[in-house]
Amino acid sequence: MNKDVDYQTFKKSLRKEFKKAVKTILNLQAYNGDLIRDFLALYIPYHVVFYNLSIMKKGSPLRIQTNNLLKEALAKILNFNLAMGPKHIIKIMKKDKADPETMNKLKLVLYIKLFQGVFGHVDKNYNLAFQSFRWCLQFIAYSKRTRLFASIADEQIGAFYELCELFISMLCCHCFLIDLKENEALVGNNLKNFIKRQNPNYSHGFDLNEETKSLQWHWSLDEVDVIEALYCVAFDAMDKITLKFSKVNENFVFSQFFQYCAEIEEMLAILRGKIWECECDVFGPRIGLLVDSNHMNETIQKNILSITFKLKNDPQIICCLNKILEGLLLSSGVQFKVIQFFYVLKLYYMQDNEYTFEASSEMDKLTIECLCIIENIIDACDNPDEVTDYQLPKVLLTAMEGKLLVAEKISEDNDCSESLDDYHPRTYQFRHPRIIIDKMKTKLKQKLRFDSPKDPETDDHWIEYWKYCYQDNIGNLPDILSRIYQTFTDPSN
């Protein structure tokens, strides 16, 4: 969170620039590849600011104009069509003479597919957007592999490729995750049907091994491979990035990058979760999914990083805090005071942010249910200080969109005799992303190689990590945040 620049001021400035770019496109009488590229180069890194504008919607003058311009330009290319795969198109281009005309064809094809993905995302056709963006990434990879630019120096298209590999890979993965969450037949219903064992007919002769095998449906799917491949492209692009941004734009870009990373880690935590059998009752055993602790820790970490890069009054600060609270609850076993701390932090930012309604409207069902449980626990406490030493129970998923199952009662940490196991590790391991961003800002290396000032096993670790990120990215804690921090970390309080 940048203390000098307000998010709304930043957004207004960007939209003013975007309005000029739109006007330029609308005034074109014929296709101009450079102006189309410049428009996309502005839109792609800041799409979260632009995508819901009316000018991007179906039937808008911009949509009509870009479709006409690109269609007319494509009609002049006779040796292929977009129904071909990216690899096949690259092979055809490679046979042509490596001249500016070939390069213009290459750019045109990429721009068409990018607009297809952009408009698919705007229309909430996430499958179309995912397929189009993935096509673009494959197209870029094949063109680089075949060295189509070897004989022609074109720094602009090289920089545009770099921008696409970083931002389109994250946007592509974002669309894939949304489509995955909304696909009840693929995810939600499967998990619910596997878990649902409350029929009395199943209370005898229940084969846990067979149930566990059937529940591990996610191992046989390729969702994890798709997500990790896109994740890898984005991290590799961030490692090699040479793009230059102003300080404010840089902070915005990093905040969005880490927020997308957190979203990816959350889904990996679910897809790589382990099956747990809960205590039997009159209806038979209950089965749930315990999320993967490593990926959930990464989710929390990247949301904290994202918050401290946010601009002042960015409504996404609240979104990230909601996700941190969700992650802490699903991590199973954290001390309640850690959740209390981030809950109070959320209240602090809500008081200072008049745009929090934007964040609340974006919450998914799982986040809403987690927040509801947390608020119920807090409301049930006559004196919250008395429960700060309590360890929260295991919380299992019985459906992708929520429907949580508490697997054990709250117990005091000192009385907890539970043995360590790979399902419920007591030691939090933080594997920071080794993104070397020295080409953008050398000092950012330190942000991504944080060594906790305390042992990771301590209950204050996440609170200390937040403080570290805040001080490193923003500056000294203001008085009110300093008092909040001391309340939850100083034993004398």
UniProtKB/Swiss-Prot annotation:
GO terms for cellular component: cytoplasm; meiotic spindle pole body. The keyword Ligase does not apply. GO terms for molecular function: structural molecule activity. One of its GO terms (biological process) is cell division. The keyword Cell division applies. Keywords: Cell cycle, Cell division, Cytoplasm, Cytoskeleton, Meiosis, Sporulation. It is found in: Cytoplasm, Cytoskeleton, Microtubule organizing center, Spindle pole body. It comes from the Eukaryota. Involved in the pathway that organizes the shaping and sizing of the prospore membrane (PSM) during sporulation. May be required to stabilize the outer plaque of the spindle pole body (SPB). Interacts with CNM67, SPO21/MPC70 and NUD1. This is Accumulates dyads protein 4. It comes from Saccharomyces cerevisiae (strain ATCC 204508 / S288c).
